[in-house]
Regions:
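Conserved, well-structured functional cores that handle cations and Mg-NTP chemistry
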Residues: 2-206, 210-227, 234
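An anionic, glycine-rich sequence signature occurring as long contiguous blocks
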Residues: 4, 21, 147-173, 177, ...
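Intrinsically disordered or highly flexible coil/loop and linker segments, enriched in small
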Residues: 29, 33, 53, 201, ...
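Short amphipathic alpha-helical "interface-anchor" segments enriched in bulky aromatics
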Residues: 107-111, 211, 252, 263, ...
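Catalytic-loop motifs flanking and including active-site residues across diverse enzymes
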Residues: 138, 330, 334, 357-363
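Buried hydrophobic packing segments
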Residues: 142, 191, 338, 364-368
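Basic, amphipathic alpha-helical segments enriched in Lys/Arg and hydrophobic/aromatic residues
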Residues: 342-394
Length: 394
């Protein structure tokens, strides 16, 4: 991935104003009134700008408005469908980044630290963002990553039971009546189901151990014939060599000759080298699929281990499995870019619609930057190839 401080520069180099206008044409029609359509574009411009905090007053100033009332109307009361814009975003990402050979879907969550009790979904809950239990909102996200780049394509706000079971809080925050409690894994499955139904070109599903630890999640993917590579805790039990034991117990007995340094497929040389052990688990012969346990070991510290379970077509080379396992980190980069570049966590809204609208527009702005960066990179490569061709002919 390209460093964060180079993203906006890449956009400028590619002549991003015209490209942003084309993107706005894709989503502007989702707004009922022209005022909202125009303000969506200005909001995107504000998110793409270099203001330090992209909240109400700062955003209003950046887009040339006297006060934040217009921005607040766009997020809270204007008539437009954030889910329809999300679908437009997914099509945009697939159009520019889609690749059946290298595409993966990545699920993860992130926290948004908050004060008070009014913001929809806020509660004292654990988030990896803080590494602790804090007052925050938690959003589940789905990203698409390929050899061309990575961007978000879906999102879902997690509502704890303290919210779904409280009619007064729900009404005040504008939570739709049909919204019921769903745990984070169920939210991830719903997002994946939407991606599957839309035909997003992905060979694998990737997730960290929060999702991968659950047999039910892995079984859900297998029932749909979806290959996966998910992190798992060392305490998970797997059948190996006729005995079902904790992964850490199996690993303690591994001979040294099962380890080998593996460079993943699609490696650009920038990934850290690891030693890997790839162990066969049970086959799913009727579907032509197989399960594996992969163990990653640091070449510097043999005690630094990572564990993955994978399910995919028979004969999948270890280089591909290793590459897919490492693809999970692409969503971490997406979170860093979306929060650091386009203000995904800078909002001051409290209601259900406003959260989804702000986050969706941030996802759209981030995807735009990823696409512009890709175009700039491809243009630079074409120029290099052209210069080499001229030099050769000379």
């Amino acid at each position: 991935m390209v460093a964060q401080d180079g993203i906006a520069e890449s956009a400028a180099v590619a002549g991003w104003s015209e490209a942003l206008g084309e993107l706005h044409e894709r989503v502007g029609h989702r707004c009922v009134r022209s005022e909202a359509r125009k303000r969506v574009k200005r909001y995107l411009l504000g998110l793409l700008g270099r203001i330090e905090r992209k909240n109400g007053w700062r955003m209003a100033e950046a887009i040339g408005e006297r006060d934040p009332q217009g921005v607040q109307r766009l997020l809270n009361s204007a008539k437009w469908d954030a889910d329809a814009v999300r679908d437009d975003l997914r099509k945009y990402v697939v159009e520019h980044l889609g690749d059946q050979q290298t595409g993966v879907l990545i699920v993860d969550e992130t926290g948004f630290l908050k004060r008070g009790e009014k913001s929809v979904g806020v509660a004292r809950q654990y988030t990896g963002t803080a590494g602790d239990t804090v007052n925050c909102q938690v959003g589940a996200f789905l990203a698409y990553s390929s050899g061309k780049g990575a961007a978000f394509i879906d999102r879902a706000l997690y509502l704890p039971k303290g919210w779904t079971g409280d009619p007064a809080r729900r009404e005040e925050a504008g939570v739709p009546e049909e919204t019921v409690f769903r745990n984070k894994v169920e939210l991830a499955e719903e997002m994946l189901e939407r991606a599957f139904a839309a035909g997003v070109p992905a060979r694998w599903v990737v997730a960290d151990s929060f999702y991968g630890r659950l047999h039910s999640f892995r079984e859900w993917l297998e029932a749909r014939g979806r290959p996966y590579a998910v992190m798992v805790p060392k305490t998970n039990a797997v059948p190996l060599g006729g005995r079902k034991k904790k992964i850490e117990q199996h690993v303690e007995r591994l001979p040294e000759d099962v380890w080998s340094e593996v460079r993943p497929a699609q490696d650009d040389g920038g990934r850290r080298p690891w030693e890997w052990a790839c162990l066969d688990l049970a086959a799913d012969s009727e579907k032509g699929m197989r399960r594996w346990l992969l163990v990653r070991r640091s070449t510097d510290d043999p005690e630094d281990l990572g564990f993955y379970q994978a399910y995919g077509p028979e004969g999948t080379p270890i280089e591909e499995l290793v590459g897919v396992c490492q693809d999970r980190w692409a969503i971490e980069q997406c979170f860093a870019e979306a929060k650091g570049e386009v203000g995904m966590d800078h909002y001051e809204v409290r209601r259900w619609d406003a959260w989804h609208r702000h986050v969706t527009l941030c996802m759209l702005a981030h995807a735009f930057l990823v696409v512009v960066r890709l175009a700039a990179r491809e243009e630079e490569e074409a120029e290099r190839v052209g210069k080499r061709g001229i030099s050769t002919r000379a």
